[in-house]
A protein has these predicted regions:
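An amphipathic alpha-helix signature
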Residues: 47-51, 135-143, 150, 154
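Walker A (P-loop) phosphate-binding motif
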Residues: 1-27, 32-34
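Well-ordered beta-strand positions
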Residues: 28, 127, 171-172
Length: 202
C-alpha cells in the first residue's frame, strides 16, 4: 500500500493546480471530484440510481447528470443532499480505494475537498496537506471562473470547514496566494519530502 497524502483546501484555494503539479513531477493522483464526474457522466454507474431518486429532470440531454440543476436542488433541499451523498459517497470511496491500491510510485496524492469534514477519509491518509488561500481570494477566483455571484460563492465557502479548522488539521501547508511559480516551488519541496517518507514507509 502506498504512502497516502490527503490534499484538501477550500473552494478556489488551488487544489487542482497543486495536484496537477504533483502529477507533473511523477506522483500518482487520485481525485474524488474526478471520480464523481466519471460516476455521473453519460453511461456512468450512478446515473440509473440518480434518475430513479431525482427524476429525469436532473439528467441532461447528453445523458450525464446536470450538475447545475442538481446543485440547485440539493442547496434548496437538505433531504435531497443527504440522498445524493448516500448514493455517491460509497461509490467514490470504493473507487478511490481501488485506485490507491493500484497506484505506482512512492506516494499518492489523494485529493479530497471535504477531507477535514470526513473522518473516514482522514483515517485513510498518512498525512494531510492543506492548500491555503485567504477567503477573499478564494471568492474572487471562484466568481471569475464560474460566473456565480459573490453571495452564491460565499454560501459554498460557509458550508465548508473553516480556514482555521483546515490549518489545525494540516501536517503541511501550501500558501497559494501568489504566482504559479511560487506554487510550483512549494510543491517541488514537498514532492522531495513525500518521496522520502514514501520510501521509508515501504
Amino acid at each position: 500500500m502506498s504512502f497516502v497524502v490527503g490534499l484538501t483546501g477550500g473552494i478556489g484555494s488551488g487544489k487542482s493546480a497543486a495536484a496537477a503539479e504533483f502529477e507533473r513531477l511523477g506522483a500518482s493522483v487520485v481525485d474524488t471530484d474526478a471520480i464523481a464526474h466519471e460516476l455521473t457522466q453519460a453511461g456512468g454507474p450512478a446515473i440509473p440510481a440518480i434518475q430513479e431518486l431525482f427524476g429525469s429532470e436532473v439528467i441532461g440531454a447528453s445523458g450525464a447528470m446536470d450538475r447545475k440543476k442538481m446543485r440547485d436542488r440539493v442547496f434548496a433541499d437538505p433531504a435531497a443532499k443527504k440522498a445524493l451523498e448516500a448514493l455517491l459517497h460509497p461509490l467514490i470511496r470504493d473507487e478511490s480505494r481501488r485506485r490507491i491500491e493500484r497506484a505506482p510510485g512512492a506516494y499518492v496524492i489523494h485529493v479530497v475537498p471535504l477531507l477535514i469534514e470526513s473522518p473516514d477519509y482522514r483515517s485513510r491518509v498518512d498525512r494531510v496537506l492543506v492548500i491555503d488561500a485567504p477567503e477573499e481570494l478564494q471568492v474572487e477566483r471562484v466568481r471569475l471562473r464560474s460566473g456565480h455571484s459573490e453571495a452564491e460563492v460565499r454560501t459554498v465557502v460557509s458550508a465548508q470547514a473553516t480556514r482555521a479548522q483546515r490549518l489545525a488539521a494540516a501536517d503541511d501547508v501550501i500558501e497559494n496566494r501568489g504566482t504559479i511559480d511560487a506554487l510550483r516551488e512549494q510543491v517541488a519541496a514537498l514532492h522531495r519530502k513525500y518521496l522520502e517518507l514514501g520510501r521509508a514507509a515501504q
